[in-house]
Amino acid sequence: MEDPGETEAHPLGATSLNFVPGYQQEEKPSPDPLYDTPDARGVQAGGSQQPARTVSLRERLLITRPVWLQLRANAAAALHVLRTEPPGTFLVRKSNTRQCQTLCVRLPEASGPSFVSSHYLQESPGGISLEGSELTFPDLVQLICAYCHTRDILLLPLPLPRAIHQAATHKELEAISHLGMEFWSSSLNTKNQQRPSEAPQIPRLKARSPQELDQGTGAALCFFNPLFPGDLGPTKREKFKRSFKVRVSTETSSPLSPPAVPPPPVPVLPGTSSSQTERLPPRQLLQRESSVGYRVPGSASGPSLPPLPSLQEVDCCSPSSSEEEGSSGSPTTSPRLSRPRHRRPLLRSMSSAFCSLLAPERQVGRAATMLMQNRYTAVGQLVQDLLTQVRVGPESRELQGIRQALSRARAMLSAELGPEKLLPPERLELVLEKSLHRSVLKPLRPILAARLRRRLSTDGSLGRLAEGFRLARTQGPGAFGSHLNLSSPVEIEPVRQKLLQLLRAYSPSAQIKWLLQACKLLYTALKTQAGENAGADEFLPLLSLVLAQCDLPDLLLEAEYMSELLEPTLLTGEGGYYLTSLSASLALLSGLSQAHALPLSPAQELQRSLALWEQRRLPATHNFQHLLRVAYQDPSTGCTSKTLAVPPGSSIATLSQLCATKFRVTQPDAFGLFLYKDQGYHRLPPEALVHRLPTTGYLIYRRAERPETQRAATEKTKTGNERPERGAWEEEKGGLNGEGKSEIAVDQEGKDQARGGHMQLEEQKAEGCPALEE
């Protein structure tokens, strides 16, 4: 069936009746088919041929859900479907044993005996996630969208079937969706392995003779910049024109050299005005240039192009910006200004190279901004919903919720843009964080600041801080028990300007940079007064006094703003340290107005708030408990160490087996765990618990047939059923794990004497062996 807008094919020279004047042919309506069914090659077989808008990945998954979401299929059916599919093909079914959804993924042939891996889906009030993964998504479709771009815990990303990926319209996708489970065995399901054989061959480059180059025949020369794959506009052409001037012409056959005079402009065709030439697209202008001789690249050809931006626009701190202004400011140039004029091409080249280095970051930033502005994408829906929710009204723990949403959005953007951009992971994270701040925090900054100011004014925090500022300015350094002071306004004003920049910034990362610059100025002044040995004891009173003299009460709400919205990894570095110093100084100033507050120590409210903040923002420490650091000295390789995870309630026998496995001991029965304490070795019974061992001493894993062991056995025989070794450590309380890591010194020794073994242990400690005292 033909489309209404298409005409029938006629023999050469025949005229269609539809175009004869006065002839009216009765048009029969062409019914639009219910589905546009693509053929096996992915070409549309029916329907309108008009180009439609691009179908997003989320829309493809939503429409074709009956194909990949088979909740009634069992494990055998999933294996049968995925058996002939390429690696990465996926199905979602329902597990009969655990009564939850399962993601089945086809694995490569060389991955193992099983060609399908199953991953259980966990549903929680916060969303849905794969078992063992930390990424959580609102629904199943967004989860599949994310794993189409990233692997996370999967072996490889999830590709769409070829027919679904190449479908151009919603009707084609609906036709595929109508097949359901039968799609996998239909002719539409073409395998991706056939793609390399069907791909068209790349045409080989054809070399041209110098005569063809001189006459301008064939394809024109081109310049390609991999950093700007789609940007070959007039600005790039003008850049080359300014950098060097070479012309290839049909007038002379002399070697290429810079022309003495500017070349003439592009000739205008007869009957065409210059204004019409200016309105022509760049491709037609390029063709007209090639007809008279292609310039590589010429100068002043075609319409006038806008000049390149000066270095001042690229970098206002560049020392060459003043030279550009001086050379272009006056119409007449003196011999003194001629030297900067000759530097222009070099400076422009440096500017272009600098911009080229920054181009990938700008491309990533623009792509991330477009994704966040598009509500039809997963990250766009998340960001837009967040903006709407914050603007509606305040909620409890509002800043913490915004930080969690920013972390989720950054993970989704990293999965979307990571494989396509030439950026290392650490730079990609920084660029995405900056884009999120620009798209989310910049519009919400006035709202959040107003709510923080209202809350802190209601509970009296801002009033107490303002009163503390007044008392600190009145009492001077004596209010903090210090004699250091920045009395000169010349020294205080630079610090105040940095703090004002901090108040104007909307990004927590930028605010931390301004805070670090202000603290650097304070440390410089502190070293001038107190010497190079000045430390935190002198810095905190000086910071408090300078804050009082600057008189900026809004720093209180900015400190909370940064503490809650700053990226978690920055909280453990230098920025987190000085942010804590700022909070402590503000707490000291607020406590000056209270009679019960101590002048030289932070208030109890600060300690409580810092403890709650650390529990909320810093990584949890329960994951690092029950870890034992094991040191092992091999006579051939020397001292090595390993960290072993010992579950709670583990016995010495379990730990001995674990040590034998980790250190590949061939005779584990000949080794045992000993407690080295009070210049003696005490054999630990197998049934003893690891976490109830004393906190002092060394745990040594060594051979059991030692003189110390034999002597201990003799003493044990004499004393009957007494166990001096066990009594030595059972009397003490405590555990090895404590609040952090426990360390076990594991040592393998030969059949030396007891004194020799002690000396060897002391030598290990002197050589840096990681056998540390508990």
UniProtKB/Swiss-Prot annotation:
Gene Ontology biological-process annotations: associative learning; endocytosis; memory; negative regulation of synaptic plasticity; signal transduction
Coiled coil: none
Record field: compositional bias (Pro residues): 256-268
Domain called Ras-associating: residue spans: 624-706
Record region (Disordered): 1-52, 188-211, 249-342, 704-774
Domain (VPS9) ranges: 456-598
Gene3D superfamilies (UniProt xref): SH2 domain, VPS9 domain
Bias (Basic and acidic residues): 704-766
Modified residues (N-acetylmethionine): 1
GO molecular function terms attached to this record: GTPase activator activity; guanyl-nucleotide exchange factor activity; small GTPase binding
InterPro entries the record matches: RA_dom, RIN1_SH2, SH2, SH2_dom_sf, VPS9, Vps9-like, VPS9_dom_sf
Modified residues (Omega-N-methylarginine): 692
GO cellular component, one term: dendrite
Residue stretches of biased makeup (Low complexity): 327-337
Positions of post-translational Phosphotyrosine modification: 35
Pfam annotation, one family: RIN1
PTM field: Phosphorylated on tyrosine residues by ABL1 and ABL2. Phosphorylation at Ser-351 by PRKD1 induces interaction with 14-3-3 proteins.
Annotated ranges, domain SH2: 68-162
Entry keyword set: Acetylation, Cytoplasm, Cytoskeleton, Endocytosis, GTPase activation, Membrane, Methylation, Phosphoprotein, SH2 domain
Modified residues (Phosphoserine): 16, 209, 257, 330, 334, 351, 609
Stated role: Ras effector protein, which may serve as an inhibitory modulator of neuronal plasticity in aversive memory formation. Can affect Ras signaling at different levels. First, by competing with RAF1 protein for binding to activated Ras. Second, by enhancing signaling from ABL1 and ABL2, which regulate cytoskeletal remodeling. Third, by activating RAB5A, possibly by functioning as a guanine nucleotide exchange factor (GEF) for RAB5A, by exchanging bound GDP for free GTP, and facilitating Ras-activated receptor endocytosis.
Family according to the record: Belongs to the RIN (Ras interaction/interference) family.
Quaternary data: Interacts with the GTP-bound form of Ras proteins (NRAS, HRAS and KRAS). This interaction prevents the association between RAF1 and Ras. Interacts with 14-3-3 proteins YWHAB, YWHAE and YWHAZ when phosphorylated on Ser-351. Interacts with the SH3 domain of ABL1 and ABL2. Interacts with RAB5A. The interaction with Ras is probably regulated and antagonized by the interaction with 14-3-3 proteins. The interaction with 14-3-3 proteins is regulated by phosphorylation on Ser-351.
PANTHER family named in the record: RAB GDP/GTP EXCHANGE FACTOR, RAS AND RAB INTERACTOR 1
Protein name: Ras and Rab interactor 1
Organism: Rattus norvegicus
